[in-house]
Amino acid sequence: MEFLDLGPFSRASGTIRLPGSKSISNRVLLLAALAEGETTITNLLDSDDTRVMLDALEKLGVRLKRDGDTCVVTGTRGAFTARTADLFLGNAGTAVRPLTAALAVNGGDYRIHGVPRMHERPIGDLVDGLRQLGARIDYEENEGYPPLRIRPGQINADAPITVRGDVSSQFLTSLLMTLPLLRTESGVSTVQVDGELISKPYIEITIKLMERFGIKVERHGWHQFVVPAGQRYQSPGTIMVEGDASSASYFLAAGALGGGPLRVEGVGRASIQGDVGFADALIKMGANLQMGDDWIEVRGVGHDSGKLEPIDMDCNLIPDAAMTIAVAALFADGATTLRNIASWRVKETDRLAAMATELRKVGAKVQEGEDYLVIEPPEKLTPNAAIDTYDDHRMAMCFSLVSLGGVPVRINDPKCVGKTFPDYFERFTALAQP
């Protein structure tokens, strides 16, 4: 197995310009593909997840011109020209879920599959919602999970669609992005959310991006979403992908743990991503933090001890960045509790179990519940811990922060960061100092 040894480091400072957001990149690619007109996308993330989306769109007949972090997409006016396709989508939930919905109403014969872990990530609630529209979708192996076979169905969007909201917000995102492709006699398409909707900021991203492409979504609280009929996706001409706020969290934490000043450019007060809320969590933990419209800067912590304050936090709104809080909790002056993180269990790995296991390797006492973690930091971090990453990019990036505790740490399978941030470790070590 490949591994990477980091540290020991004690300082971190400098400036980093973030790569484009994964969540925004894949949404914008699909919206541009479905729109009328040509869209130029700038600061597009180059990663495993965006590459599988790009490859899939090309197989579906979409014309793309790529040049570095810029991609020009010629829209299909709401219907893919390829009526058959076999699409391998890796472990990219941001590709599998929205493409499943778009293809379910496209009138073709498609197969969607991915890596083994993708076939363990649930999609049943989305399929149930699409079947309410008349979509024909079959499970090839296990009920409720990919791989999927999609065939032409009799699509009718007049009746409201009901979808669960407590497993993944991507199910609702996928339905919302698909509804403008449909005609209705009632004049509206409606989605009702059953139960508590998790990761609400990701739905806000979807709605705001749909607006950029000319689609108005009416939101009634968090339980009903209405798309008026007669709308079509229209290219905005040019759209820039803002920096990835989840990726920002590692560098913001490094600025707190390593003294800074460390400035992150590409996200800030004007960001549409919920994970920018990680900055608020870091302030509650005692970090000295300033924020502009598209930058955030951290200069260590405000306590003479140099330690962070422990917090008790509901992480529903920042599920990905909450992983960074879990590792930052190793540097706190007391036990930190992270709540409402059940969605971690159906991500790239079971992140609750994985996080608890790896935190214990560096000396923490960890209590793992169904939807929470309690992390009690050690007196001293265990040096030379070998961190398993579970083919999960965020596990690898989070645990790089351990090296800022003045101890070396080994990251197994470091190339898994290719999912969202291929050169993460080069960028991290350029800012960290002994």
From Swiss-Prot:
Entry-linked HAMAP family: EPSP_synth
Alphabetical list of SUPFAM superfamilies matching this protein: EPT/RTPC-like (SSF55205)
Organism: Paraburkholderia phytofirmans (strain DSM 17436 / LMG 22146 / PsJN) (Burkholderia phytofirmans)
Annotated active site: D320 (proton acceptor)
Pathway(s) per entry: Metabolic intermediate biosynthesis; chorismate biosynthesis; chorismate from D-erythrose 4-phosphate and phosphoenolpyruvate: step 6/7
Gene name of the encoded protein: aroA
Described purpose of this protein according to its UniProt entry: Catalyzes the transfer of the enolpyruvyl moiety of phosphoenolpyruvate (PEP) to the 5-hydroxyl of shikimate-3-phosphate (S3P) to produce enolpyruvyl shikimate-3-phosphate and inorganic phosphate.
Full protein name: 3-phosphoshikimate 1-carboxyvinyltransferase
EC main group: transferase
Any single GO BP term: chorismate biosynthetic process
Lineage: Bacteria, Pseudomonadati, Pseudomonadota, Betaproteobacteria, Burkholderiales
